[in-house]
Amino acid sequence: IGHGLNKQELEKNKIFDSYWIQNFNLSQQIPLDKESVDYCLMVAAWQYLQYPENLTKEIARILSREGKIIIAFSNRAFWHKAPNIWTSSTEEERVKYVRKVLISNGFNEPKIIKKFTEPALNIFNFLNKDPFYCLIATKE
């Protein structure tokens, strides 16, 4: 089952046997039955959520017992689309925020993965690292 905002992208993804289109900033109700999925993977999306607490509660509802949520993000974003809690926080504060929301909405202590590529000079001679953060939590 897939979710997104772009019908053309979802149609081209052959992994999904079904999908739906929904803006979670307008409605956090997910059109799936209670305890109907085992995993929820959210990649490069959390940083745009205006109501992550509400959506996390809804994800807990649709996940099976001991279902897992996997949230992955980096320090990249369309900053004009991200809420203040994201734009005004450090990378470490963002990880702590996602952790707090998960725990307060029915998930166990998440496993936190942090990976960084070696810094490289970009065309402006600044050192850039490419961080990757992932939190994996199980529904209690």
Name these PLM-found stretches:
Residues 1-31:
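Class I SAM-dependent methyltransferase SAM/SAH-binding core
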Residues 106, 120-140:
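Core SAM-dependent methyltransferase catalytic element
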Residues 68-99:
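Conserved class I S-adenosyl-L-methionine
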Residues 38-53:
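A short SAM/SAH-binding and catalytic strip from SAM-dependent methyltransferases
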Residues 89-114, 133:
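Short alpha-helix
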Residues 53-68:
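A short glycine-rich, Lys/Arg-flanked "PGG" loop and its adjoining helix->strand segment in the class I
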